Amino acid sequence: MSSIIERADFDLIAGWVQPGERVLDLGCGDGSLLKRLIEERGAKGYGVELEEAGVLAAIAKDINVIQGNLEQGLAGFDDQTFNHVVLSRTLQTVRHTERILAEMLRVGREAVVSFPNFAYWKNRLAVMGGRMPVSEDLPYEWFDTPNLRFFTLLDFESLCAKMNLVIRERQVLDEAGRLVTEEPNFLGSLAVYRLGR
């Protein structure tokens, strides 16, 4: 049986999905989140993944997945097809940020986005020490990272305001996966948002 990756943001996302809802996971990797949503929530899950290894791993988990590049949009999906469109730890890797967020809310009633917070105090400390941060949420060295963008909670919320997106809920986690309520832009390592129009 294929292993399922456990992540704290998956716990939050799973809590937001109601039984039987339709979920599209963009950049689904090996399909671990979708597998969990299908098994625990009875969701109808579909994935889009660029990397062949991820597609094959998702197929091995019996996930409905297509190989595709998010940068080319979601033209293959009709408007409002899904209850939730998830972009988990992937937004920082896309070039056309505004377009993908708009597409998510075209094909889904709600967008769920998680990303590493570059303003987390340990990341700031690394940069102040003259080094790019490497952590569980930012696991790559500067020379091999797929990340194109390094942004903070405040940056993301400014973008949401510019795009007239409604932040329905925001949860921020520390490196241990615990909820952060005080000074989240400073103490939070990973942010998870529910967005609507």
Regions found by a protein language model. Give the residues of each.
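S-adenosyl-L-methionine-dependent methyltransferase catalytic module, highlighting the catalytic core
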Residues: 98-103, 110-197
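A short SAM/SAH-binding and catalytic strip from SAM-dependent methyltransferases
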Residues: 84-95
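Conserved alpha-helix/loop element of class I SAM-dependent methyltransferases that forms part
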Residues: 4-20
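Class I SAM-dependent methyltransferase "Motif I" SAM/SAH-binding loop
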Residues: 27-29
